[in-house]
Regions:
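Intrinsic, low-complexity transcriptional activation domains
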Residues: 1-257, 264-268, 272, 290, ...
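Intrinsically disordered, low-complexity transcriptional activation domains
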Residues: 3, 14-20, 95-96, 100-109, ...
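Non-transmembrane, amphipathic alpha-helical segments
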Residues: 98-105, 135-138, 142, 235, ...
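Long, amphipathic alpha-helical regulatory blocks in the mid-to-C-terminal portion
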Residues: 218-230, 276-304, 327-346, 364, ...
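Tandem amphipathic alpha-helical repeat scaffolds
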Residues: 254-260, 310-314, 371, 511, ...
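Short coil/turn connectors between adjacent alpha-helices in alpha-solenoid helical repeat scaffolds
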Residues: 262-277, 314-328, 520-524
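Acidic/serine-rich, low-complexity amphipathic helices located in mid- to C-terminal regulatory regions
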Residues: 310-402, 440, 577
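Extended catalytic-interface subdomain
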Residues: 378-389, 398-449
Length: 679
């Protein structure tokens, strides 16, 4: 009873102005009517049916000098003492002062089997939800700078019809989206309602101000997913009256990336407007993420936001951007801190649909980590040797929100004992599984390549290669690529995913064969030249495809950079060495067909070598270098063996294809080619 009295006294004190009088809610104050000062919502606002707009401003009469750009200039109080449940109210109550903080231990999140508490519990895989992940209680104040940033994020939602069209079209066409579509679509409806309410408000600035306060208070609450939550109701925990900043940041990230891929074509007049929109969405996503790090403990929504922000930054800033690598570090840290890398043992307090969503999130982050580590020649951030997370089941997005579906039982007639769907369907989870399997072998290859060659390396690499081939052959037949995979009766994304998966699979073999070849052997070996030729022909086959609804140029550009350059470099250097030295050419296929493919590849490079292309400098240098070498190869006259390779190349190809660090492009000007990806 004494504690209840103390809490009531503190709450009553928080609702008073500095002059000792009780504060009125903003609606009563503006209408100049008597307020009963009830918390969290006054009875007058309840009677009028405007409870959602009832809030107590910390400094209602404070106004910045000059033009009022952002209505909240004093900072906003937020209380991190409670956990939000489905039945709890999140109506914000702001205070005039900061009450003394009462501290609780800050628990570190997931604690594994070697942690300091492992000997005290039978459950080694401690659930982050059971630990609470609580932080200091009592009221704190979010600085005005971040309050203004949240207002800017909300203003970025101004043209919500464009955002909604971009996201819906992205999910309609994409086979690589990670977050299940029902979670996003249900959230869109709620955020759209907020935007409509703001437009219809009598005072736009005041509504934005009250909405900002409400979102700050909601986001500051510890995000808890009750075990009884159903997938169809999951969005209600972070939308509507409980709208959180994380989901707004996710929506901005998805819209920015969809815009980059030229979706919602009628909404944009030019490439410049698309670039500006993508940059605006990235700025909003960055601001949302940084503010969430201040306001709330780590949760699943935070990981959604970090991942989507990383993907948007990847296309906006370029794959070699320091920002991308830094964000990947954040994502891996958060995944380990929340325990997504470990499969729960025994009973868990996490709903089944959320466990499956976490498996999808981990699989997507794992393969993205391997791609970036390969491209940049750096150690991966999420090594498999410390993880045992199961692959996601090959089920539809809609299955996650279906009633009565057991996601852990393969006997339900949907998936087989290996987790693959039994109906031969193309689903987003199918490609997550395929790319995850390929990435586990890439993980092993990276570990060997970054450690350096040893006497036992050959045996290890051959074993990895054999297991990788066996894994590919064991995939469901409809998910494996063949030259006839491109079927006009199927959506473009369904046709693209087998090509991308096949290229990732071939890249594993390419890396292995390059490591097995002698370091400075310009001839390569038959296996290396063969896989390089397969990669090049697959890249060129992608270049022949056309799709009226999707601009494939962005995908083709990235494919050339990631796969075309390395394979073409190996082949053209081997041809040049054969021309100069007269030694046998180890390629077992048709030499003339290979030269034709290289000529077509050079033609693609030249086609991208125009000032309007963001990678203009890179493609121009590459086309010039490759063209000179092809001219030398086709020239009937002989060339002295001692002629320096650098005389006809703008790249140092010996370094370029030196796979010790898997750094194919160490001599290229990434500042021009990638860091300004959209400009």
């Amino acid at each position: 009873m004494e504690m209840d009295d103390e809490e009531e006294e503190e709450e009553e004190e928080d609702s008073r102005r500095r002059n000792g009088k009780q504060a009125s809610c903003e609606l009563c104050r503006r209408d100049k009517v008597r307020c009963d000062h009830a918390l969290p919502v006054c009875n007058r606002c309840k009677a009028r049916g405007v409870s959602s707009q009832c809030f107590y401003h910390p400094a209602p009469l404070t106004r910045p000098k000059g033009r009022r750009i952002f209505p909240l200039a004093e900072g906003v109080s937020f209380d991190r003492a409670r956990s939000t449940g489905p039945s709890e109210s999140n109506t914000p109550v702001a205070a005039d002062h900061v009450s003394p903080s009462r501290h609780k231990p800050l628990l570190p999140g997931y604690l594994g089997p070697t942690s300091f508490v492992s000997s005290l519990t039978d459950d080694m895989d401690l659930s982050p939800d059971s630990q609470g992940l609580e932080v200091e209680t009592g009221q704190r104040v979010l600085p005005p700078y971040w309050v203004q940033k949240i207002s800017e994020v909300l203003l970025a939602l101004g043209d919500f019809s464009t955002i909604e069209e971009l996201i819906r079209e992205y999910y309609e066409l994409s086979q690589s989206a990670v977050i299940a579509s029902p979670f996003i679509f249900n959230s869109l409806a709620s955020v759209k309602a907020i935007c409509k309410e703001r437009i219809a408000s009598r005072d736009f600035d005041d509504f934005t101000s009250s909405l900002t306060v409400r979102i700050i208070q909601n986001t500051a609450e510890t995000f808890v997913i009750p075990l009884t939550t159903q997938g169809a109701d999951f969005h209600t925990l972070f939308t509507g009256p409980r709208t959180r900043l994380e989901i707004i940041g996710v929506i901005c990230s998805l819209a920015g990336r969809a815009c980059y891929f030229w979706l919602a074509q009628k909404k944009f007049d030019s490439q410049i407007s698309r670039s500006q929109f993508t940059r605006k969405m990235l700025a909003a996503s960055d601001a949302a993420l940084q503010t969430c790090k201040i306001l709330t403990p780590l949760n699943d929504l935070t990981i959604w936001l970090v991942h989507e922000n990383l993907l948007l930054s990847h296309v906006a800033n370029g794959v070699s951007s320091p920002h991308v690598w830094s964000r990947l570090g954040e994502l891996s840290t958060d995944i380990f801190a929340l325990g997504l890398h470990r499969e729960p043992k025994g009973s868990t307090e996490i709903p089944g649909f959320m466990l499956e969503s976490r498996r999808r999130q981990f699989a997507a982050a794992y393969q993205l980590d391997k791609n970036l580590a390969t491209f940049l020649g750096r150690p991966p951030r999420i090594p498999w040797r410390y993880s045992d997370c199961r692959m996601p089941l090959d089920i539809s997005d809609e299955a996650l929100v279906a009633d009565g579906l057991s996601l852990d039982s393969p006997q339900d007639g949907i998936v087989d004992s290996m987790g693959w769907n039994i109906n031969g369907l193309f689903q987003r989870s199918s490609w997550l599984r395929v790319r995850f399997i390929i990435s586990t072998f890439r993980d092993e290859i990276l570990e060997i390549s970054l450690q350096g060659m040893a006497p036992s390396t050959v045996r290890l690499l051959e074993d990895i290669s054999n297991r990788c081939h066996s894994a590919w052959e064991s995939l469901p037949i409809h998910l494996r690529y063949n030259p006839q995979s491109w079927d006009n009766s199927l959506p473009a994304a369904v046709c693209l995913m087998p090509i991308f998966s096949y290229l990732a699979y071939l890249c594993n073999d390419f890396l292995i064969q390059r490591l097995l070849a002698e370091k400075n052997n310009p001839r390569g070996n038959a296996a290396l030249l063969s896989v390089s030729s397969d990669i090049l022909s697959t890249v060129l086959r992608l270049g022949t495809q056309r799709e009226h609804r999707v601009d494939l140029r962005q995908d083709f550009t990235l494919t050339i950079l990631l796969y075309g350059f390395p394979s073409a470099s190996i082949l053209i250097k081997a041809l040049q060495h054969h021309k100069r030295s007269g030694e046998p050419f180890l390629y077992e296929g048709s030499r003339s067909a290979l030269i034709r493919n290289l000529s077509v590849f050079i033609a693609h490079l030249e086609a991208f070598s125009h000032p309007d292309n963001v990678s203009y400098a890179l493609f121009q240098r590459a086309s010039q270098a490759f063209s000179k070498i092809i001219d030398e190869i086709l020239e009937p006259g002989s060339v002295a063996p001692d002629t320096e390779f650098e005389e006809v190349s703008l790249f140092d190809y010996d370094q370029m294809i030196d796979m010790d660090g898997l750094d194919w492009f160490s001599t290229m000007d990434f500042g021009v080619a990638f860091n300004q990806w959209l400009f």
